[in-house]
Swiss-Prot record:
This is Cornifelin. Keywords: Cytoplasm, Keratinization. It is found in: Cytoplasm. Part of the insoluble cornified cell envelope (CE) of stratified squamous epithelia. The gene is CNFN. GO terms for cellular component: cornified envelope; cytoplasm.
Length: 112
């Protein structure tokens, strides 16, 4: 004889925590706040991307992989609890790559 399931098992306690999301310390267009980073992002963006990847703790070749920079930027947002979305990350890196790289480099300098 089988007994019908009338309710699903539930957790006795729920632990919920909220983390406060913050903004990037500098804006996307604040490139001139750090002139060496600005120059590197303008004239050697792949070198800056490799440095960002290395400083973030990833392989320095990650920016050369498809989606590598996107995953680093998204990982940076998640690690530092910066508000935004994958779509915003994609748009920043697709339409304004040098500015996005400079913003990421400045954020790492400030946070580390």
């Amino acid at each position: 004889m089988s007994y019908p399931v009338t309710s699903q098992p539930q957790c006795a306690t729920t632990s919920c925590y909220q983390t406060q999301l913050s903004d990037w310390h500098t804006g996307l267009t604040d490139c001139c706040n750090d002139m060496p980073v600005c120059l590197c992002g303008t004239f050697a963006p792949l070198c800056l991307a490799c440095r960002i990847s290395d400083d973030f703790g990833e392989c320095c070749c990650a920016p050369y992989l498809p989606g590598g920079l996107h995953s680093i930027r998204t990982g940076m947002r998640e690690r530092y609890h910066i508000q935004g979305s994958v779509g915003h990350d994609w748009a920043a890196l697709t339409f304004c790559l040098p500015c996005a790289l400079c913003q990421m480099a400045r954020e790492l300098k400030i946070r580390e």
